Structures are given as structure tokens and as C-alpha cells.
Amino acid sequence: MLRAGPPSHTLLRLPLLQLLLLLLVQAVGRGLGRASPAGGPLEDVVIERYHIPRVCPREVQMGDFVRYHYNGTFEDGKKFDSSYDRHTLVAIVVGVGRLITGMDRGLMGMCVNERRRLIVPPHLGYGSIGVAGLIPPDATLYFDVVLLDVWNKEDTVQVSTLLRPPHCPRMVQDSDFVRYHYNGTLLDGTAFDTSYSKGGTYDTYVGSGWLIKGMDQGLLGMCPGERRKIVIPPFLAYGEKGYGTVIPSQASLVFHVLLIDVHNPKDTVQLETLELPPGCVRRAVAGDFMRYHYNGSLMDGTLFDSSYSRNHTYNTYVGQGYIIPGMDQGLQGSCMGERRRITIPPHLAYGENGTGDKIPGSAVLIFDVHVIDFHNPADPVEIKTLSRPLETCNETAKLGDFVHYHYNCSLLDGTRLFSSHDYGAPQEATLGAHKVIEGLDTGLQGMCVGERRQLVVPPHLAHGESGARGVPGSAVLLFEVELVSREDGLPTGYLFVWHEDPPAHLFEHMDLNKDGEVPVEEFSTFIKAQVSEGKGRLLPGQDPEKTIGDMFQNQDRNQDGKITAEELKLKSDEDQDRVHEEL
């Protein structure tokens, strides 16, 4: 470096004797310079600022360290020196006697990227002595200078916030791990590096010695999504050594930084409740099966996945290791219908490797979750009585009963599925006959006519994992039911029962024309008469004609289209005979 060795170019000061001679010349004030009266020799440096940058954040002052290029010529245009020819910038402190006086004065007030033409009179250059073999005595010197860098040993890191998001969940602190994009330039705008060309962010710890000191300082306090301009003096960057061929010695560095995300290895899952429905009577625990919608994004807002785009909830067990640990933790304690934001550090998500092409390594993940429903495989039907006519509730529905009921069915998020009111008539069912889902069958039992209930039916007592037409798989169903009517059912296997003992000589009563045989017409007429007279009843909920036809087929043993006295036998007698045979 220039401070350590002998002079390497003509701008450096002469030996002490020559210096003392030059200092005898009275210096004139700094400025554009002026000639002596009557066209005599120049009294001061003449400065022509022929290119001034539009923005000048700082000007060269006494004691600043500068880096610049120059061409030096005589009045006739003959070149005597050039930093360009040496492919080396001048890097030196201004105003402390390291440069000829004319150059010291000519650099004062200069901006980075400014270009100046300087005319240095002999007494502010190399005087009457000159430089043997290079600069003759009393030579006026002409310099074309471009300033590329300026800094001072008192400088600190300069941070300018270009964009700061309105919501800042956390700021960078020492020991945090950050992911950021950057463009790196020298102070004159020369680019030396960028993360954007490398297909990924720059990922590192802050304050742990992994970065240059100035970047460690410049990142502190940043928010995810914030953009900063960070100007770093060389003694907080790469100093005298520079870096390879891209960062010269003693170069100030400028970084334009976009912080993508930040976390700390000690971070846990962060929860934020966005919407909590009233009346949360149950919260999810490990072992529950949950259906939820989500939007998944990186900390800078980049969306990487969404269940909404698939028009299907994400269905899984909670706390069983089927999903990333952070989501397993974040879903527990949630209510049905709740909306919450779950922020998951990478060590509880996909770690250093990331996954696929949308989640990079060491990425913090943010999930906005809407819990649709959850249940436990051991859940029974939840029954809540809404209204019950106590004064008329003498009998309740039981297995085998034939019932009429109205119902509304929806998902727990309020999505309407079915309603008996859409059909203009109550639904009918025989309890225990497996004609309705098990949970609804269970929920109807024990109801009085006129009673209203709310039933919460878990999927294993409804339509299971596969769902049904209009019903998603693994969906918990919500029913509001009202029992309209009920009839006692018949014993299993019976199509008709007598209210009292059957008539004696049953065949004679059935043989209406007394011809010794009963065709289907006579049989049907007889059974219908028993029902209309209240002496017996058919299996409820079935087509009477079909039921009577089945009864006739059972009695017509030889299938000849008529029943004889020998063929006719009551079911109770058949059951008794079967018991005897088994015995």
C-alpha cells in the first residue's frame, strides 16, 4: 500500500527540502483557482467540474481516505503519468501531506463518480525542481480525475431503509439465522456480487463471525420483507486485502438487501388467533383427526401451497407424526371454526434441506389455518336436546320402531348438505334396520314425538373416510332433528302381527268362498280387513302390497298359487317347530 512503501507515482510529495521550498509559496483559498493579475502565473489550482453526479451523499474532506483514477499531462497534452496504465487505483488519505498540495486541494469537496479537470501550477506541484527524467522544473500539471470511493476512519455502517412492511412480526438480533437477497456494489456502482444470479438466498447466522462486521451490524433490526441500503467502510468489510479480483483493497461496499426471513434456533412455534368462534366447548388434542383448510407462505409472503386450490381440506391425525412437528404442535388447542396463524421455524418444518422446489432450505413457514372440524375415533354421537314436550312424552323411540322425522344436515362450518324440508315430507326409517347412518339411528333413539335434538355425528358413525354424494370424506356431521311420529316396530323377521290372539280356525276365516283353498286375492282381502279393523298390523315403512305378497309366498309352500289348510302356519308356530327341531 502507498502508506507503507516509497512513492510509486508522481502525485506523492517530494523530499523534505523540496517540501519546505514549496511551502514558502503563499497558498490561496480553495476554489476554482484564479490567475495572477495581468495574465501572470496561476496562484491556485484551477478546478473544472465537468461531470457531477445527480446525488452526492458526501464530499471529500480533510483526513478522508479516497480511491481515484487519474491521467496526468503537461500543457501540450503529453502524458507523464496515469493510474489507468498501472491498472491500480490511487488509495490515499487527503490533506495530510501524502499528496502534492495541488492534488490535495483539487480533491476537496469531490463526490463519488464526479470527474474533474485540475490545473496545478508549479508551486503547488513539483516546483522549480521537478522530478528528474519525468517532470521538468516549473511545470504546470493537468490532471483528469474520477473519484471512486471516499471514507473516513471515524465512519460507521450507514443504513438506509428503502421499504419497511407495515407489519413486522420480529426484528433481526444477534445469533439469529437469516435468509436474504442482496446486490453488492462498490461505492461507484460497480457490481461485484449478487445472490439473485445464484438461484437462492444467502443464508447465514448474524453476529457469529460468519459475515463481515459491517453486514453483521447492518442486518440488525431488519424485518422480514424489509429492503435496506447498507454502506460499509472498508475497515468493517475486507480492508486492505480486498477480496479476490472483485473487491479492491480499501474499498467501501454498498449492499442493497431484501430480508426474506429470520429465525433463531431457539424459536418455538408462534400462534396467532385470527378468529375464534363463540362457544368453543372442545379443543383439539393429540390423537384427534382434523379437517382443515390452509394457505402456506414463506415469511416474505410467497405462497407455496394452499388446500383451497385443490378444493379439498387437508385431513390428518394431530400429534401423531403424520405432519411436520410445528404443524402438529400448532393445531393442538384449536377450536372448530377457528382461524389461526401458525409460524413455524425451519427446525420444526423442513430444516436445512427444504422440500420440493417451493420451500427452500432453512425457510420459516407461515400457515393461515381454518379448522373445519375434528373428532376422535373413540367419539360417540353427541346429543343435545333443544326442546322436549314433557307433558306428552310417555313413550320414546326404540330399536325396531318406525319413525317419521324432519332433519337439517350440515357440516360443522355451516355448509348446508341436506334437509327433509326440501322434499316436502318427513323422512321415515325403521330404527336399527341399517337404513340410515349409525349415528343418526342412535341419535333418534329415546326421542319423544315432538322432541327436537341436535346431533354431532363423527365420521366413523356417518359416511367414513370415503364420504358420500355431497359429503366430504371424514366429515363430522351436524343434524337438527324433530321426531314427527313413531310406530312400534315388529319383531325381527315378522311381516304382520296380531294385536290379540289370532282367530280360531284361521283357515276357515281366510277361505272366503269356502272352496278349501286360498288364492292370493282372498289372502290379500283377509289381511287388509284385519288391519282396517285394528286386529293386526303390517310391518311399518314397507309397501303393503309387497308385504302381503311376501306373506303369501311364505305360506304357499309348494308355490302352486294357493294356500291349503295344511300349508297355513303362523310364524310363531314355525319358530317353535324350529326350536324343537334344533333340540
UniProtKB/Swiss-Prot annotation:
Motif position, Prevents secretion from ER: 580-583
The name this protein goes by in its record: Peptidyl-prolyl cis-trans isomerase FKBP10
Residues covered by region (Disordered): 534-583
Places the protein is found: Endoplasmic reticulum lumen
Signal sequence bounds: 1-27
GO MF annotations in UniProt: calcium ion binding; FK506 binding; peptidyl-prolyl cis-trans isomerase activity
InterPro entries hit by this protein: EF-hand-dom_pair, EF_Hand_1_Ca_BS, EF_hand_dom, FKBP-like_isomerase, PPIase_dom_sf, PPIase_FKBP_dom
Origin species: Bos taurus (Bovine)
Ranges where the PPIase FKBP-type domain occurs: 63-151, 175-263, 287-375, 400-487
Free-text function comment from the UniProt entry: PPIases accelerate the folding of proteins during protein synthesis.
Keyword line: Calcium, Endoplasmic reticulum, Glycoprotein, Isomerase, Metal-binding, Phosphoprotein, Repeat, Rotamase, Signal
Gene designation per UniProt: FKBP10
Top-level taxon of the source organism: Eukaryota
Chain positions recorded as Ca(2+) 1 binding sites: 511, 513, 515, 517, 522
Regulation of activity: Inhibited by both FK506 and rapamycin, but not by cyclosporin A.
SUPFAM superfamilies: EF-hand, FKBP-like
